[in-house]
Structure formats: C-alpha cells, structure tokens
C-alpha cells in the first residue's frame, strides 16, 4: 500500500503490485483540504513532524493571534496561551517571566529556531526584546525536555520559529498606546522587508523594531509600576539553496534594551 500526504491536502492510499524487472509509475492528484490543515511542528522531537503524530502535546501560537490581540512582543502574545502564565516581577526593573507548571522563568528554555541561544537569565529579560514581526509561529511544550533542548528545559520549552523570505514584500507600522490617560505612552515602530531572487535560490528577510515606553505610576505614590523602557531590535534571516534538498542559512539577531524605574512625581503626604 502506497500512502501520500502533504500539509494542506487530503491523504490518499493506493494498493500497488510490484513486478520484477518492471518500472511502476503512479501519479497522485491530491485534493486540497480547506477545513483543517494538519500542522507541522519541530519542537516535540527536533524534526518536522505532523502535529497529531508528535509524541508530546505542542501548543502553537500563530501570527494571527499577535495581530488580533495587538501584541508587539513575545511576552504579550504568550499571555493568551493556555497553560502558560506570564507575570511581571521586580518592582525595580519590571521584568517579565514565563511560568510553566508553576516553576520560575529560569526553568523554561527559550529557543530561536530550535537553538538554545538564550541563557536562563536572558530568557527572563528577553521576552520583551523579541518582536512579533520576526515570529512565524511559537511552539510551546510543557514538561521536561533537558535531553533535547538543554539543562534549562525543566518546566517547559518555548521555541520561536522565525519568518523566512517567501516573496518580495515589505511593511511598516507605528503604534501608540496610552495608559489610562495619564500621559504615559508606549510607542512601537516595526519594519519588515522580504527579498527573494527570481529563481528562488536566494532570499533574505530583514526585520527591525524600535520601542519606547514611558514610566507609568498607577497609584500616584511617586514610583512607577511600569519602568521606562527603550528597546531596539534588528535581525536578518537569509538562505542560499545549494540543491533541491539542501540550503545554507544565515541568521543575525541584535537586541538592545534599557529599562529603569523613575520617580514620576512627588510622594503624597501621609
């Protein structure tokens, strides 16, 4: 029995009989499946696997969620993921951390394209440094995975799959948010550029984000609950296809952040 399947198409099976000395050619015309696409994940066992066949449960966060929730960073998008808790800690710096299975953020491994680039410390402060415009999808696995992804993957794993160039395109956006009409603003500027050669052998995806958030004092005690934040991120994802089955990839990520608690106003008298 010969079985053929592809992402976005219905599977087909056909019984064939092989005879010695003869070449058999079978042609398949797959029907597109518009009802449900069988997603492919890589975090479960470090190889591309159909989501329903993965040995562990993998939750996927798509760019559509970031758009619908107006999320500009990874930390804002993970808030809407079931089984994952994103909390803001430290009154001084206001960093964000991901809690999976009740454990601190340092026990969750942050991956970029299945590689443990972030240390346990950077995984705590880096959630707000990863812009949504570089993310193709986010795969979240709850439970230990130290044998596959490193010693920090005790509570779970968050794998960020970055976007690859598909066609020539570009986008620019600027968003301004205000906190309860207090005069504190969150400005976010994002830029994307995708370039692909005519023969599809070479391509490059460039992204950038600049964010400036004013300090915000919610209760008027003179000390900001949300610290002042300046964030700049720029990156590149390029490839060169050497053959139909192999390619050379180049990635560059630069992230810079400054945050500080400010004394917004004089303290109120007791």
Where are the regions that the model predicts?
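Short, acidic, small-residue-rich periplasmic hinge/interaction motif at the N-terminus
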Residues: 3-10, 19-67, 105
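Short, polar/charged loop or turn motifs at beta-strand boundaries
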Residues: 56-74, 97-103, 113, 178-180
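Extracytoplasmic beta-strand/coil segments of soluble accessory domains associated
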Residues: 75-119, 136
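Non-catalytic regulatory/gating segments with a bias toward low-complexity or hydrophobic composition
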Residues: 78, 138-139, 158-160
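Membrane-embedded beta-strand positions in outer-membrane beta-barrel channels/transporters
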Residues: 97, 137, 157, 190-192, ...
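Periplasmic-side early beta-strands and strand-to-turn transitions of outer-membrane beta-barrels
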Residues: 167-177, 181, 192-269
